[in-house]
């Protein structure tokens, strides 16, 4: 048992793991391979034995011995000071941590120093439960215990101060409750897209498509995923071909992509982050091969700096199954790709409207990027009627136009 990854006393690599020098070497090795290192910052709470508890009790939400007697699971006595355990407003407190007071000016200054130190050791930071520090959320959670509400937001104070010394470091918000845009306005470069995940799990294709109608200035800064440390394993949540379809959506939509440890080989057992062991699970070789092909494909510049377009699609008076289909294109110079996904349990058909005005008077080869099947289509028909597609449940096209 590793203990809690959120119960942080100090942001320094343990000596038995090599200390800061080992982290610096690991970062250099990653950078040499074209990778960047992202570290975690937990802003909402710290370990009960954090030095601030004794040196700066004013940095925390405090209580009384009456509070402790009344709600012993909500408060803790730390050498004569009663502090609130960390929490979010919808769940019981976390018993291994104490709650910082995000409204306290001293705490904000100390957090800036802490994050500046972290930023010197990495290329980006994932900020745990970042929305809990927003003034509205914090005030609603802690009310009078928090004291006077500041005129500025926590992240508006912290992020610019850190970037003044480390301008290239990325800030990534773990975000819930549809607060992604507000966190972006507070300075975050990227935010988790939990809403798309929920739509893929629970909703239909029209819901997913509606989500993707947002402006690209917003979508480009979302982190798309179908699995992370909090959610159940994708292989357990998206049975059979549904995972393939969901993965194609997440990988080929605008924005950053998060692939979680064990997702590629199809692990199904969700593990607490406190454990350093896991049960043996046979790898899903077919799924792993699919992910390797998909990730190699989306590594191309086309899917990062190309022009993305959400496609219209239509059906026929006696066939409305086009509602089960989502489609979009990417274009960069002469390169162009169409992605079509059937997000349903039903065989579905549609005509997909393409955004390109130079299709006429050409014959086009449509090559399946992920399996190299090839189709030949007339450009006049593509321009006038759109591309006819017919897909089995949870199947997709990933078509390169030549």
Q: Where are each of the predicted segments found?
A:
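Active-site and adjacent substrate-binding regions of carbohydrate-active enzymes
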Residues: 1-402
């Amino acid at each position: 048992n590793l203990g809690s990854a959120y119960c942080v006393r100090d942001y320094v690599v343990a000596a038995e793991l090599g200390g800061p020098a080992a982290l610096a070497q690991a970062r250099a090795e990653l950078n040499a391979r074209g990778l960047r290192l992202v570290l975690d910052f937990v802003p909402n709470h710290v370990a009960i034995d954090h030095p601030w508890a004794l040196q700066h009790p004013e940095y925390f939400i405090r209580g009384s011995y009456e509070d402790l007697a009344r709600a012993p699971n909500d408060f803790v006595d730390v050498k004569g000071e009663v502090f609130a355990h960390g929490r979010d407003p919808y769940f019981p407190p976390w018993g291994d941590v104490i709650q910082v007071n995000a409204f306290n000016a001293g705490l904000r200054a100390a957090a800036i120093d802490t994050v500046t130190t972290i930023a010197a050791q990495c290329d980006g930071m994932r900020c745990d439960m970042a929305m809990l520090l927003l003034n509205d959320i914090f005030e609603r959670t802690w009310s009078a215990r928090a004291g006077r509400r500041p005129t500025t937001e926590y992240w508006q104070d912290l992020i610019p101060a850190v970037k003044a010394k480390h301008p290239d470091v990325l800030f990534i918000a773990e975000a819930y409750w549809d607060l992604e845009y507000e966190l972006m306005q507070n300075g975050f470069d990227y935010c988790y897209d939990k809403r798309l995940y929920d739509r893929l799990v629970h909703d239909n294709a029209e819901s997913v498509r509606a989500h993707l109608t947002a402006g690209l200035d917003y979508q480009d800064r979302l982190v798309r995923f179908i699995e992370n440390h909090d959610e159940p394993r994708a292989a357990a949540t998206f049975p059979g071909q549904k995972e393939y379809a969901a993965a194609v959506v997440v990988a080929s939509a605008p924005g950053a992509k998060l692939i979680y440890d064990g997702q590629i080989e199809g692990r199904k057992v969700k593990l607490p982050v406190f454990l350093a062991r896991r049960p043996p699970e046979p790898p899903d070789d077919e799924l792993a091969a699919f992910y390797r092909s998909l990730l190699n494909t989306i590594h191309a510049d086309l899917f990062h700096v190309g022009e993305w377009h959400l496609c219209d699609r239509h059906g026929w008076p006696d066939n409305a199954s086009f509602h089960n289909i989502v489609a979009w294109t990417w274009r960069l110079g002469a390169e162009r790709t169409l992605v079509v996904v059937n997000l349903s349990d039903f065989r579905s058909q549609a005509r997909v409207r393409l955004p390109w005005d130079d299709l006429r008077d050409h014959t086009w080869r449509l090559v399946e990027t992920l399996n190299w099947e090839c189709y030949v289509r007339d450009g006049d028909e593509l321009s006038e009627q759109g591309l006819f597609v017919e897909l089995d449940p949870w199947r997709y096209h990933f078509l390169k136009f030549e």
